[in-house]
């Protein structure tokens, strides 16, 4: 059974992180972890995983609008394998199409005074997690 969950919006410069749980099927943005050409700051990610101790990790898979792989898809898959090996958690991949667009829309809708990349990436991770929870 799922306990707490972590979702990751993988990116080459930043990785958005959200937490959630299946009972209420709600997600909350945690923040972002810096990445350097797709390699995350593992020390920061280690701290987040240790603190939240998720049973499962959901990672957004960047596909195009027709569900074809993009230039970053392979990097995201490699990252997912590394996350699974590093944390020994079940990792689920889910199409993240439109998650960033949805995150930007939510920030604009709620009149967020400053739409920063940090807010967008963490909120995109929420969208990924909410989508996964609604399908499982």
From Swiss-Prot:
EC number: 3.1.-.-
Principal subcellular localisation of the protein: cytoplasm
Subcellular location(s) of the protein: Cytoplasm
The keyword Cytoplasm appears for this protein: yes
SUPFAM superfamilies reported in the protein's UniProt record: Ribonuclease H-like
Domain of life: Bacteria
PANTHER family hit by this protein: POLYNUCLEOTIDYL TRANSFERASE, RIBONUCLEASE H-LIKE SUPERFAMILY PROTEIN
Protein name: Putative pre-16S rRNA nuclease
Organism: Francisella tularensis subsp. mediasiatica (strain FSC147)
Source taxonomy: Bacteria, Pseudomonadati, Pseudomonadota, Gammaproteobacteria, Thiotrichales
């Amino acid at each position: 059974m799922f306990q707490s969950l972590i979702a990751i919006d993988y990116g080459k410069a930043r990785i958005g992180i959200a937490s959630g749980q299946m009972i209420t099927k709600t997600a909350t943005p945690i923040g972002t972890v810096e990445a350097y050409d797709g390699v995350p700051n593992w020390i920061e990610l280690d701290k987040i995983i240790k603190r939240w101790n998720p049973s499962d990790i959901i990672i957004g898979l960047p596909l195009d609008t027709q569900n074809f792989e993009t230039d970053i898809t392979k990097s995201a898959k490699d990252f997912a394998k590394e996350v699974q090996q590093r944390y020994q958690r079940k990792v689920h991949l889910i199409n993240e199409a439109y998650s960033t667009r949805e995150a930007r829309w939510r920030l604009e809708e709620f009149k967020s005074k400053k739409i920063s990349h940090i807010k967008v990436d963490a909120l995109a991770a929420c969208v990924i997690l909410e989508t996964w929870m609604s399908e499982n």
